[in-house]
Design a protein with these regions (language model features):
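Catalytic core segments in nucleotide and nucleic-acid processing enzymes
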Residues: 1-52, 287-429
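Residue(s) in the substrate-gating loop at a strand-loop-helix junction
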Residues: 2-285
């Protein structure tokens, strides 16, 4: 099923179990995000609501929102629920979207709000989502590891054991007797000692996950964004040249997270997720295995928002301010030269219908907010709605000034403008 469609199971039978629906965890203040939610049948729809982000409800029940993913609908885990985008997940270049997001300078903790994965529940067969989850985790993981490489790998004291010519650390009496004394090898002594090295358990876990990620991308096909990630993997593996990749499954599970080294904390979580995804065996990274995915969700509205942020930052740099704290809320983007308020709305085909009244009020409030614009403007500040369409994956902002997008106004509203920013589409093979 696709976004905004009715759940294909008997909603009434599960109303006691789900209640109002499945609300996404860990939401920031002011957000109200759902994987699916109970909807009562709508009254007849008026013209200016045709392109609303709310689903058209012809029958009361649970309806999907703009969140895609896989989830078990029943407690016994016999009824899988797989939700895809209206555009078709097999057509969207998610790797391109993820790469643009990370190039915008988004922090790992912010990107973690876009998606969540539950590795403990049984996996769900969802071939239509095979191009989504693995590239997402790999791209997120590589962005974190890239930051670690820039700062330098963490070193620590590592326990070593070796048969040496000179005593180093402590002699392992029993093993030295068995390996050297009984064999009359008096020129050797078996020692246990500590060495300050990059070859720590955490770094070996990360390197192992990098090798797994390399195999994941190899079966993903060819694209410009894929080549960029492969280049990142080669750079990271070079930085881990003095680190081994041998690590046991029980060691992977026992590695503790770091509160001081935040990048390592995120990298360890993601590395454990990648290895768990393929049951800790690199031979399980196959096209057939990709058809089964763990329970997960991706908030497409937030992903699109960060994708647009990456495109804006690529074109206009630090002139674009993200989530400025205002008295009326947090606009997605604000530019002070020229003065513009921009907001993404994940509402496909928005160019044909009227803007919803609540959107007009929301952006009008931002443009008059003294916390956002402390100096009184000489005229009304332009408000821009950014919405998705299918099309070429190029950055529409890159070759234009922001003022150039303000030449065409909304047909019903002064100083309101719309910009279509395409979702990147994979080339037909």
């Amino acid at each position: 099923m696709q976004e905004h469609e009715k759940i294909p199971y008997d909603s009434l039978s599960f109303q006691e179990y789900w209640g109002e629906g499945m609300r996404l965890p860990g939401q920031s203040k002011g957000l109200d995000r759902w994987f699916f939610q109970w909807q009562w049948r709508n009254n007849p729809i008026v013209d200016d609501e045709q392109d609303s982000e709310k689903p058209v409800v012809t029958e009361s029940g649970y309806y999907a929102s703009y969140v895609i993913g896989a989830q078990w609908f029943d407690e016994a885990k016999t009824m899988p629920l797989v939700i895809t985008t209206k555009h078709g997940c097999d057509r969207i270049d998610f790797l391109k979207m993820f790469s643009v997001c990370f190039n915008s300078g988004i922090e790992a903790k912010e990107f973690s709000k876009i998606y969540a994965v539950d590795m403990e529940q049984p996996r769900i067969k969802a071939p239509e989502l095979k191009s989504v989850l693995s590239p997402l985790i790999v791209a997120h993981f590589l962005s974190v590891v890239r930051d670690i490489v820039k700062r330098g790998l963490k070193k620590d004291y590592v326990q070593r054991e070796d048969n040496l010519k000179k005593v180093k650390g402590h002699i392992d009496i029993s093993r030295n007797e068995r390996m050297n004394v009984l064999k009359k090898r008096f020129d050797k002594v078996f020692c246990r000692y500590q060495e300050y090295s990059e070859d720590t358990l955490e770094n070996r876990l990360i390197k192992k996950a990098l090798i797994f990620s390399q195999h994941v991308l190899q079966i993903a096909g060819l694209s410009e964004s894929l080549l960029s990630l492969q280049h990142t993997i080669h750079e990271c593996l070079s930085a881990f040249g003095n680190v081994g990749d041998q690590i046991e499954v029980w060691e992977v599970k026992t590695i503790k997270h770091h509160k001081i080294f935040k990048e390592y904390d995120d990298a360890i979580k993601l590395a454990q997720m990648i290895l768990h995804r393929y049951d800790y065996s690199i031979t399980n990274i196959t096209t057939a295995e990709e058809e089964f995915c763990p329970v997960f969700w991706i908030d497409m509205a937030m992903l699109y928002e960060h994708f647009v942020l990456g495109l804006l930052r690529e074109a206009y740099g630090e002139k674009i301010h993200y989530q400025v704290h205002g008295h009326t809320g947090y606009p997605d983007f604000v530019c002070y030269s020229p003065k513009v308020v921009l907001d993404t709305k994940y509402i496909p085909r928005f160019e044909y219908g009227n803007l919803d009244t609540y959107i007009v009020r929301q952006l009008s409030g931002y443009s008059r907010d003294k916390w956002i614009f402390p100096i009184k403007p000489e005229s009304n500040i332009p408000c821009v709605i950014i919405y998705p369409v299918e099309g070429e994956e190029e950055n529409p902002f890159k070759s234009k000034r922001l003022e150039d997008f303000l030449n065409v106004e909304d047909r019903c509203l002064w100083n309101f403008h719309r910009i279509a920013v395409p979702l990147p589409i994979l080339n037909d093979k």
